């Protein structure tokens, strides 16, 4: 039997030439976006003032299973892709488990995460359309960094609204984004109408991704030749991230390995959706029975404690309405250290798959997450991002179950990025000052009270 190497590296020639679209495989596609004024399904014209034309086409495409990746995007991808698929031999040994553990590492670029996969695609299409300026939000900073890299490469101006608490926790993220040419504004800010309103209603707030989205959208609609781009949640972002799963499946197929469990952290859902796409497509066609697990923070539990309802994607309630698992656009998450998971909602694709019983969701508290992150970095040598460490936590839990039952399951998880800008969080954990935040039912009800009444 061929020994599986520590790292399974694909060649440059094996880089996927197509993204995979999960929606055509689903028995029932996610509900369409709803125009919050007319309460009718959004058309391309409804979305055109905010998003790039080609991205709108991808967003609304429920038909094509594969979409070709333009050569210019593939050329950019080759600077950091294919990314390594690693067999976690050292972690397996430390856990004393018969399970095989694999992780797909997306932190091999300067942004430190998977976010660059969609950033380069979105900026490329903006450039093709002749746009000169983009706006966006960022939580932990990986998306903002990725987009600043892509904008610097293609020569487009960028304004980034960064969740305030994350900006304070990770000041050097701002320096990196500015080095690539971006303008970075902590959110909520006094530079927008919605920011000023949120500050007035929630003095001292640390902000949220929903709030930052509102500010970025407001600026995009008031700036000439400008569009807004989003780093997660939307269908086209999940599409671009499918390259993660496609490479993962190709690497495993080389050695005849079939996963039993696939695990991903879930904030907006794009990395999870991208990782599971080819495996879920096969499951939907009856070709496997993989168990999928979405892992979210206990402090922002949209899947495990949220409601499946139409909701706005932003705090300012300016986006189209999306049917998703949500805590309500007015929900303000506690200032936990997983900035990239501080979002009230969830990808409509991931939400629909979860609602249809195609995957499980778990929430974990951050002290348990950092316990797993610490063990992982000591075994595997990579300092993981807090977001990624949610998947590590559950992968370890599943491996421990295998130790107890004697089952030799194959566990695959997404290591979405590195934690080098999260050292304050690691320091808090190491010093024993980290505190778990879990919203009460009363806290959640405040968010649910902001849900719009929609009949569709």
What is the meaning of each model-derived region?
Residues 3-131:
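Positively charged, low-complexity intrinsically disordered leader regions
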Residues 118, 129-165, 258-272, 292, ...:
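A short, small-residue-rich loop immediately preceding and capping a beta-strand
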Residues 105-116, 134-144, 234-237, 263-268, ...:
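Active-site nucleophile and cofactor-binding loops and adjacent substrate-binding regions
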Residues 84, 103, 115, 122, ...:
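Buried hydrophobic positions in well-ordered alpha/beta secondary-structure cores of metabolic enzymes
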Residues 121-131, 145-157, 178-179, 276-286, ...:
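Alpha-helix C-terminal capping segments
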Residues 135, 143-206, 302-312, 423-431:
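Active-site-proximal loop->helix
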Residues 266-274, 366-432:
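Claisen-condensing/thiolase-fold acyl-transfer catalytic domains that form or cleave C-C bonds
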Residues 68, 198-236, 244, 256, ...:
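Active-site/ligand-binding loops adjacent to catalytic centers
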């Amino acid at each position: 039997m061929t020994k599986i190497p520590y790292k399974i590296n694909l060649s440059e020639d094996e880089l996927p030439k197509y993204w995979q679209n999960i929606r055509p495989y689903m028995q029932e596609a996610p509900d369409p976006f709803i125009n919050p004024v007319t309460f009718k399904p959004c058309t391309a014209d409804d979305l055109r003032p905010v998003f790039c034309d080609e991205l709108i086409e991808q967003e609304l495409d429920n038909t094509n299973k594969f979409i070709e990746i333009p050569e210019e995007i593939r050329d950019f991808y080759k600077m950091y892709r294919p990314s390594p698929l690693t067999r976690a031999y050292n972690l397996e040994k430390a856990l004393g488990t018969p399970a095989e553990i694999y992780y797909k590492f997306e932190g091999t670029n300067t942004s430190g995460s998977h976010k660059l996969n969609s950033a380069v695609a979105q900026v490329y299409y903006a450039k093709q359309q002749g746009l000169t300026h983009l706006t966006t939000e960022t939580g932990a900073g990986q998306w903002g960094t990725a987009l600043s890299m892509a904008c610097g490469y293609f020569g487009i101006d960028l304004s980034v609204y960064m969740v305030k608490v994350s900006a304070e926790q990770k000041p050097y993220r701002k320096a990196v984004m500015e080095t690539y040419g971006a303008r970075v504004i902590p959110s909520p800010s006094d530079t927008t109408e919605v920011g000023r309103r949120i500050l007035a209603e929630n003095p001292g707030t640390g902000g949220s991704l929903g709030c930052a989205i509102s500010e970025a959208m407001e600026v995009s609609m008031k700036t000439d030749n400008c569009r807004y781009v989003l780093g997660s949640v939307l269908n086209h972002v999940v599409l671009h991230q499918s390259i993660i799963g496609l490479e993962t499946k190709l690497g495993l197929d080389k050695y005849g390995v079939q996963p039993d469990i696939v695990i991903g952290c879930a904030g907006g859902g794009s990395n999870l959706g991208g990782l599971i796409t080819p495996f879920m497509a096969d499951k939907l066609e009856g070709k496997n029975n993989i168990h999928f697990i979405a892992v979210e923070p206990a402090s922002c539990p949209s899947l495990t404690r949220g409601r499946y309802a139409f909701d706005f994607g932003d705090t300012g309630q300016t986006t189209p309405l999306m049917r998703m698992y949500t805590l309500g656009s007015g929900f303000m998450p506690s200032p936990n250290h997983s900035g990239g998971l501080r979002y009230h909602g969830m990808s409509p694709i991931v939400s629909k798959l979860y609602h249809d019983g195609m995957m499980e969701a778990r929430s974990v508290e951050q002290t348990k997450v950092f316990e797993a992150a610490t063990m992982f970095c000591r075994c595997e040598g990579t300092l993981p991002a807090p977001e990624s460490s949610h998947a590590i936590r559950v992968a370890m839990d599943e491996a421990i179950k295998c130790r107890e039952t004697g089952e030799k399951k194959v566990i695959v998880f997404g290591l979405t990025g590195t934690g080098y800008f999260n050292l304050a969080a690691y320091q808090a954990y190491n010093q024993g000052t980290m505190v778990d935040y879990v919203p009460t039912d009363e806290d959640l009800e405040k968010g649910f009270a902001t849900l719009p009444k929609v009949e569709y």
